[in-house]
Curated annotation (Swiss-Prot):
One Pfam family linked to the record: RINT1_TIP1
Domain spans labelled RINT1/TIP20: 163-724
Gene3D superfamilies linked to this entry: Dsl1p vesicle tethering complex, Tip20p subunit, domain D
The protein's role, per its UniProt record: During cytokinesis in male meiotic cells, required for completion of cleavage furrow ingression possibly in conjunction with Zw10. Required for maintenance of Golgi stack number and morphology. Essential for acroblast assembly.
Protein name: RINT1-like protein
GO cellular component assignments: Dsl1/NZR complex; endoplasmic reticulum
Family per record: Belongs to the RINT1 family.
Species this protein is from: Drosophila melanogaster (Fruit fly)
InterPro entries for the chain: EXOC6PINT-1/Sec15/Tip20_C_dom2 (IPR042044), RINT1_Tip20 (IPR007528)
Origin: domain of life: Eukaryota
A single GO BP: Golgi vesicle transport
Length: 724
């Protein structure tokens, strides 16, 4: 191991690597680099030679400059030291004087602070007096500007209260804020009265809404100006104002005064029609007040945004959407109404179910028509309060249970949706389609819920319903009321749809909420339900395949007992035909496969076909080949029956049927091989050769799915090979 290189050596190596590079063909450059650096060293050596006459003057000048700089620095340091001593003596002499005037200086500072304090009090009093003189005048602009000098915001240095924000004078701050709050109330009352008068002249909120399109330009401009003034003036109390509580569980930001005034006539009309003993105030007709809210919003929201949004922008409220705030105020009327009525409505199942439908429809139209944000208060917040949410879920569960019973007790629940389209790969029973529509309807109802926790409760209900539907199918099948094929088609459709839903963004979000932020894998929320359905489907397909194979086996007795050992040689001029003894067996198989293809969905039929083929493959090898002796003619006939009939039959449904019957196909190759080849192969397999040497001749015959022991047993079935 070489010792670690120093920093300088590493720099030299890096420089050489940079100069020569990684290309081995450039190594000849090393000699050039050596000569180059030698010349460079000579030049440096000559430059640094102090005895060289040419360098004497240069070095002499440099040394002289350095000496002069050092002398200058020493001189300045000496001056600083003298000044420090002088300053210390002076401070020591003046210390008694400073101590003598310190108390007076403190008094001066106190007087200065008192002066500033009194000036601020004077400013507040002068502003208050100016507001008092202007409050009854007609100049609102002057009135607002005077108020803004008193308060514009806690962080605004242009107002008195803003300047006091960082000052430790609680009494003065309290006095300034109380003064601002007092005048804010009076000023807001004055502007509100003027604003209401202008709205009245504009015929705002009257039934003749066409008047909005013909409002006087003067009235509109006046309303905009007053709105701007009300947006501009703020109260210190607003900075710490609590959230508005609509219901004990629903809180939101308070509605701005401008929006309150715009809403006032609508609130009055709403209370007139939908409270008390009015005929329009009916518990069974929530759609009446929902429709009224939507109609008012449609009639006015564009006008509100177009007319008053510029006023908010001029007042500095750039992120304030007045149109949506107005809609929020209208929705709040519905929330307040619903909060009062829901307790009584929830006692009646029919009324409660109707309220749920109408509320969900109302929320959907709000979002589609007005772009109502999900973060705003909504009527859904009322019906998702814990006690009502549980009642809603219970109602959904009861309704779905009854609906499932109706679906499965119908006259033909397992009839295919389009029974005539047998070319269709997917066979969908009516009951499966109706059940999935039922689940999808539940999703549509809870899709608009804001909180993931509420949505997860409905997802849990969906999963319970899937399991309940599966159990109902199990009962129907176990009792013999419904055969396996319709059940399989129903399960297959459920699995297909649930897999598709599992990749839907809505259900992926629910999975994320369920699994949490630390989940390592993204799975489907229906994973467990799908696994249970698929497990049962595999069991049903195995039973179906076993039943089909047993029917074929029942017709195979004559074929298995045919004269395979004594079968005469086939005339070479005559073509092979199917063994007469196998006709009935193959006919049963033809009918079974045809019926399965016609009745099962394509993917189920493909899986069942493989299961049937696997069982037939085992049966043909173990019950037929291993229990029978074959003459050469018998082996040829059996090979023909298998490869040209059995394989061809399955070839109608799959591209390479021989892959489904690997062991039977290999047995046919061994039985039909030439006698000499068979003898040599048997001798090799019985010998003491290695496994590789034994499998090599098998690979040459393309016998790949049987081990040497099984191959020996098959070869011993040949009559033309003597047993030793």
């Amino acid at each position: 191991m070489h010792a670690e290189l120093s920093e300088m050596e590493l720099r030299i190596v890096a420089r050489l690597n940079e100069e020569i590079g990684k290309d081995a063909s450039q190594l000849h450059r090393a000699s050039h680099l050596v000569s180059h650096y030698k010349k460079h060293l000579q030049v440096l050596s000559q430059t640094l030679d102090y005895e060289d006459p040419q360098n004497v003057s240069c070095y002499k000048t440099a040394f002289q400059c350095q000496q002069q700089v050092c002398e200058s620095i020493d001189f300045e340091l000496e001056k600083l030291a003298h000044f420090e001593d002088k300053l210390k003596r002076k401070l020591k002499e003046c210390q008694p004087v400073l101590e003598g005037v310190a108390e007076d200086l403190d008094k001066v500072r106190q007087l200065q602070r008192l002066q500033q304090y009194l000036l601020l009090v004077q400013d507040i009093q002068e502003i208050s007096a100016a507001l008092g003189n202007a409050i009854n005048g007609k100049d609102e602009d002057k009135l607002v500007n005077i108020y803004l000098t008193l308060y514009e915001g806690n962080d605004c240095e242009h107002s008195v209260v803003g300047r006091l924000h960082a000052v430790q004078a609680q009494s003065l701050k309290s006095f300034a804020e109380r003064t601002a709050i007092y005048w804010h109330k009076l000023l807001l009352k004055r502007l509100s009265s003027a604003f209401e008068a202008v709205l009245k002249s504009m015929r705002w909120a009257h039934l003749e809404q066409q008047a909005l399109n013909y409002s006087s330009a003067r009235d509109t401009a006046k309303a905009q100006l007053l709105a701007e003034y009300m947006f501009l003036i703020k109260s210190p109390a607003e900075e710490r104002a609590p959230l508005q509580s609509i219901t004990p569980s629903i809180v939101c930001q308070p509605i701005n005064r401008v929006v309150q005034l715009l809403l006032a006539p609508y609130r009055q009309r709403f209370q007139f029609h939908f409270t008390g003993t009015r005929q329009t105030n009916r518990l069974d007709k929530p759609e009446w007040f929902y429709t009224q809210i939507l109609n008012w919003g449609k009639e006015t929201h564009f006008f509100v945004g177009k007319t008053f949004q510029p006023a908010a922008i001029k007042a500095g409220k750039l992120d304030y959407n007045l149109r949506l705030e107005f809609i929020r105020g209208l929705v709040q009327l519905a929330i307040e109404k619903l909060a009062v009525d829901i307790e009584q409505i929830a006692q009646d199942q029919i009324l409660f179910a109707h309220l749920l439908d109408e509320t969900l429809a109302f929320e959907s139209e709000l979002r589609e028509t007005f772009g109502y944000p999900a973060s705003f208060p909504s009527a859904i917040s009322v019906i998702t309060q814990p006690m009502y949410l549980l009642r809603w879920i219970s109602l959904e569960e009861r309704f779905c249970a009854e609906k499932m019973d109706d679906i499965l007790q119908a006259e033909t629940p397992f009839q295919l949706i389009d029974p005539n389209s047998f070319e269709n790969d997917l066979k969908i029973p009516k009951c499966a389609d109706q059940f999935m529509r039922l689940l999808d309807a539940i999703k549509d109802r809870y899709y608009g819920l804001i909180q993931p926790g509420h949505q997860l409760q409905f997802l849990h209900l969906q999963l319970e319903l899937i399991d309940s539907f599966r159990q109902r199918l199990v009962q129907l099948h176990s009792s013999g009321a419904v055969p396996s094929i319709p059940i399989l088609n129903a399960i297959n459709y459920l699995v297909m749809v649930l897999r598709e839903w599992g990749e839907n963004v809505h259900y992926l979000h629910l999975h994320a909420a369920l699994a949490g932020p630390n989940a390592t894998e993204i799975n489907s929320v229906f994973e467990h339900a799908v696994a249970e359905l698929e497990h049962w489907a595999r069991q049903l397909m195995r039973n179906l395949a076993t039943k089909a194979t047993n029917e074929m086996k029942a017709k195979s007795m004559s074929y298995r007992r045919d004269a395979w050992p004594t079968m005469p040689e086939q005339n070479s001029r005559e073509p092979f035909i199917l063994s007469p003894s196998g006709g009935e067996m193959f006919q049963v198989l033809v009918t079974l496969l045809h019926n399965l293809e016609r009745e099962l969905s394509a993917n189920l039929f493909t899986q069942t076909l493989r299961l049937i083929a696997h069982q037939i493959d085992d049966f043909m090898l173990e019950s037929m080949v291993m229990n029978t002796k074959f003459s050469a003619a018998g082996a040829a006939q059996f090979n023909y029956d298998m490869t040209r009939n059995l394989f061809a039959l399955f070839g109608q449904y799959t591209r390479r049927p021989e892959l489904l019957f690997k062991r039977t196909h290999d047995a046919c190759k061994l039985l039909a091989a030439a006698r000499g080849t068979a003898l040599l192969l048997l001798e090799t397999l019985r010998g003491n050769q290695s496994v590789e040497e034994k499998t090599k001749p098998l690979r040459e015959l393309h016998v790949l799915s049987m081990d040497s022991k099984q191959c020996i047993e098959v070869l011993e079935r040949r009559m033309d090979i003597k047993m030793f």
